[in-house]
């Protein structure tokens, strides 16, 4: 019997099937999601096993564990997440290839314009953000949606879930997305990045922190009813851009 989950996402409908002990996602499409072959994820031991993936639905094994939040982020968990990510980025899995981030910026901007909304801080840095977007790499398999609520702890293992936005992309975006969406402090960020290794460029990571926060702001404002407040992410865009300008002086 299908039982609707309490925490439904913003796009799909999700259920628990108590007869098969499976997670069921009834797909809804937004133009960006469900692009990659989900069966590729069976190559990763930190992903729930995929049983069914078609245009209508996704069925995976049910992971019975603890959904992560900021209060649970021990050093060991941060290290595990870092190791999971370098494994993904070096996996050579062939996800759908596109500059999804640039396209999301473009579509969200058009939607916001149609809603007659203005975001002065993002307008102020419009040209610089566009330059950053043009230089995004798309040679590595990436998750693209690394919120803590998409991670489940089972004993010493951390499962990554909700892969619907996975594409080929830039490793720096994944790293920045996790750091920014999880609100890591400097110590936590260092623990995480040390576990990931040295296969990234700090200057590009910083630029992608700007892009991540700007993208979250755009996503929020592309909704007719704002799903949550955008001030934290707007303030970060301003702070990081000012810091970038000072470093160039």
From Swiss-Prot:
Belongs to the peptidase S49 family. It comes from the Bacteria. This is Protein LicA homolog. InterPro entries: Kinase-like_dom_sf.
């Amino acid at each position: 019997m299908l039982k609707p989950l309490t925490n439904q996402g913003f796009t799909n409908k999700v259920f628990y099937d108590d007869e098969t002990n499976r997670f069921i996602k009834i797909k809804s499409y937004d133009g960006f999601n469900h692009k990659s072959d989900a069966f590729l994820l069976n190559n990763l031991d930190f992903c729930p096993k995929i049983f069914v993936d078609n245009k209508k639905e996704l069925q995976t094994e049910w992971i019975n564990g603890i959904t992560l939040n900021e209060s649970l982020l021990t050093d060991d968990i941060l290290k595990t997440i870092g190791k999971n990510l370098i494994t993904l980025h070096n996996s050579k899995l062939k996800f759908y290839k596109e500059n999804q981030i640039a396209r999301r910026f473009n579509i969200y901007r058009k939607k916001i314009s149609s809603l007659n909304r203005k975001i002065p801080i993002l307008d102020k840095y419009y040209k610089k953000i566009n330059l950053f977007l043009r230089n995004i790499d798309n040679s590595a398999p990436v998750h693209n949606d690394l919120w803590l609520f998409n991670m489940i702890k089972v004993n010493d293992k951390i499962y990554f879930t909700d892969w619907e936005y996975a594409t080929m992309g830039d490793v720096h975006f994944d790293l920045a997305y996790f750091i920014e969406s999880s609100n890591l402090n400097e110590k936590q960020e260092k623990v995480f990045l040390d576990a990931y290794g040295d296969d990234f460029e700090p200057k590009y990571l910083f630029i992608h922190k700007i892009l991540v926060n700007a993208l979250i702001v755009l996503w929020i404002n592309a909704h007719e009813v704002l799903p949550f407040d955008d001030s934290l992410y707007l303030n970060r865009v301003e702070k990081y851009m000012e810091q970038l300008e000072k470093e160039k002086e």
